[in-house]
Amino acid sequence: MSEIAQDSNVSIFSKNEKKARELILKLGLKPIQGVSRVTFKKKDGQIFAIDRPEVYKSQGGNFVVFGEAKVDDFTQRLAKAQESLQQNEGVLPAGQDAVSKDPQSIQADMQAAADSATDKPSADDAVDDAEVDETGLNADDIELVMQQAGVPRAKAAKALKEHDSDIVNAIMALSG
């Protein structure tokens, strides 16, 4: 009998669970990878949490979740987080202030930052004003890049020229 490595992830299923998994696959449910935690909140505020769940998605967009559901005591987790914060209160990275803000002021700060970013014209915006030579480019390709990347015609034409009329690379360059 071979040994199983200590850090390997091995699951042993019962006969009934194995049958249930086969039925899930027959129903066309697709497994979703990368889900580390699922929480369900009831109307009365009670929270159920499933750590390391197995999540499947149906063709209709519904999700099926398998795992051990536990009642999540949010107040206890919050108390632990506050306790650890108080222990580390004196230790802040350089240049940061311990300021508590309400949600409205945080949103106002975010809006101000977004407004200041849009007020500054960038070098790319100068391209919008200038005419770009569209010779050798297909008008349908330019329209497609404009639509997919959400950019003006001049930017789309410039990106297509830079990428030798490669639509995919032009869209990726403008989107990224």
Swiss-Prot record:
<comment type="subunit">
    <text>Part of the nascent polypeptide-associated complex (NAC), consisting of EGD2 and EGD1. NAC associates with ribosomes via EGD1.</text>
</comment>
<comment type="similarity">
    <text>Belongs to the NAC-alpha family.</text>
</comment>
<keyword id="KW-0963">Cytoplasm</keyword>
<dbReference type="Pfam" id="PF19026">
    <property type="entry name" value="UBA_HYPK"/>
</dbReference>
<dbReference type="InterPro" id="IPR002715">
    <property type="entry name" value="Nas_poly-pep-assoc_cplx_dom"/>
</dbReference>
<dbReference type="GO" id="GO:0015031">
    <property type="term" value="P:protein transport"/>
</dbReference>
<feature type="region of interest" description="Disordered">
    <location>
        <begin position="85"/>
        <end position="127"/>
    </location>
</feature>
<keyword id="KW-0653">Protein transport</keyword>
<comment type="function">
    <text>Component of the nascent polypeptide-associated complex (NAC), a dynamic component of the ribosomal exit tunnel, protecting the emerging polypeptides from interaction with other cytoplasmic proteins to ensure appropriate nascent protein targeting. The NAC complex also promotes mitochondrial protein import by enhancing productive ribosome interactions with the outer mitochondrial membrane and blocks the inappropriate interaction of ribosomes translating non-secretory nascent polypeptides with translocation sites in the membrane of the endoplasmic reticulum.</text>
</comment>
<dbReference type="GO" id="GO:0005854">
    <property type="term" value="C:nascent polypeptide-associated complex"/>
</dbReference>
<feature type="domain" description="UBA">
    <location>
        <begin position="137"/>
        <end position="176"/>
    </location>
</feature>
<dbReference type="InterPro" id="IPR038187">
    <property type="entry name" value="NAC_A/B_dom_sf"/>
</dbReference>
<dbReference type="InterPro" id="IPR016641">
    <property type="entry name" value="EGD2/NACA0like"/>
</dbReference>
<protein>
    <recommendedName>
        <fullName>Nascent polypeptide-associated complex subunit alpha</fullName>
    </recommendedName>
</protein>
<dbReference type="InterPro" id="IPR044034">
    <property type="entry name" value="NAC-like_UBA"/>
</dbReference>
<dbReference type="Pfam" id="PF01849">
    <property type="entry name" value="NAC"/>
</dbReference>
<feature type="domain" description="NAC-A/B">
    <location>
        <begin position="14"/>
        <end position="78"/>
    </location>
</feature>
<keyword id="KW-0813">Transport</keyword>
<dbReference type="GO" id="GO:0005634">
    <property type="term" value="C:nucleus"/>
</dbReference>
<keyword id="KW-0539">Nucleus</keyword>
